[in-house]
Amino acid sequence: MIPGEVIPANGEVVLNKGRRMVKVLVAHTGDRPIQVGSHFHFAEVNRSLHFDRQEAFGMRLNIAAGTAVRFEPGEEKEVDLVEIGGKRQIYGLNGWTDGAIDDENLPSFLASYQVSEDKEDEEK
């Protein structure tokens, strides 16, 4: 055995069983590549990535832990998202959530995102 080696059991391993999953079409309108990690709250990614943030609220990329998806400028691609598990609390990142990722906090998230978008427009 090699240190860190993973030897899976025979058969298939089902990941994220019972969690809600969605597909989201993402368009990158910025001028620099953007990389999003596996456990980042997808609704809070860079504003140069355009997609339905309401649909992505409380979701992360459905990819292996420690990996990422890269978005090149001008690129449009569909990604698979899965519900964030655990205590379902998000703090930090872009500061648009800072609390529970539930239906009750969705309006607050959308308002925070809009305020940050308006500030960015004013700076241009």
Swiss-Prot record:
The keyword Cytoplasm is annotated on this UniProt entry: yes
Cysteine pairings via disulfide bonds: none
Transmembrane segment boundaries: none
InterPro entries for this protein: Urease_beta-like, Urease_betasu_sf, Urease_subunit
Record-linked Pfam families: Urease_beta
Subcellular location field: Cytoplasm
Any one GO CC term of the record: urease complex
Leader sequence segment: none
EC number: 3.5.1.5
UniProt GO molecular function: urease activity
GO biological process: urea catabolic process
Main location: cytoplasm
Catalytic activity: urea + 2 H2O + H(+) = hydrogencarbonate + 2 NH4(+)
Lipid metabolism found in the keyword field: no
Alphabetized CDD domains for the sequence: Urease_beta (cd00407)
Pathway(s) served: Nitrogen metabolism; urea degradation; CO(2) and NH(3) from urea (urease route): step 1/1
Keywords, comma-separated and alphabetical: Cytoplasm, Hydrolase
Description of how the protein assembles with itself and partners: Heterotrimer of UreA (gamma), UreB (beta) and UreC (alpha) subunits. Three heterotrimers associate to form the active enzyme.
Family: Belongs to the urease beta subunit family.
Protein name: Urease subunit beta
